[in-house]
Amino acid sequence: MNISFFLKPKVEVKYLQDDCSVQQALADMLESGFTAVPVIDKTGRYIGTIGEGDFLRLLMRTPAEKAAAMPVGQVRRRVTHRTVSMDASMEGLVELVTDQNFVPVVDGRGMFCGIITRHDVIKYMTGIWKAKT
């Protein structure tokens, strides 16, 4: 099944602009309860996903005041989250969600469209398995 039915669109997703400060990003993540969020540039292009571990590694090697003011887009990310396009299938996401809480969805120009959550992939696959039994 095509992922468009399960897409959580950009307007409903917590994401960060790449020029957002680390201090603001951490405050936003703490408030939202998310441990990782997509990062996009000013044009809406997906840059990557940043997580709590990325911030912790930054704080371990950078003075706190300098780290707090650093733009999120300059923080080194340990993991590169793989993206999919709108024509991807839910079945094709199973492998991706074993390592990612969500899968970023981008268009042909790399513009961020939204996400598919691990929960939705599991729910979809469980429904298929139940239908077969």
Where are these regions (language model features)?
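A short, polar/charged loop-to-alpha-helix boundary motif
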Residues: 54-69, 121-133
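Bateman (tandem CBS) regulatory domains
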Residues: 1-13, 68-80
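The conserved cystathionine-beta-synthase
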Residues: 15-33, 40, 82-100, 106-108, ...
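A glycine-centered beta-loop-beta connector
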Residues: 29-32, 37-54, 97, 105-120
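Short, flexible segments with low predicted structural confidence
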Residues: 1, 26-27, 46-48, 64-69, ...
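Regulatory sensory and allosteric helical modules in signal-transduction proteins
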Residues: 61, 77, 82-84
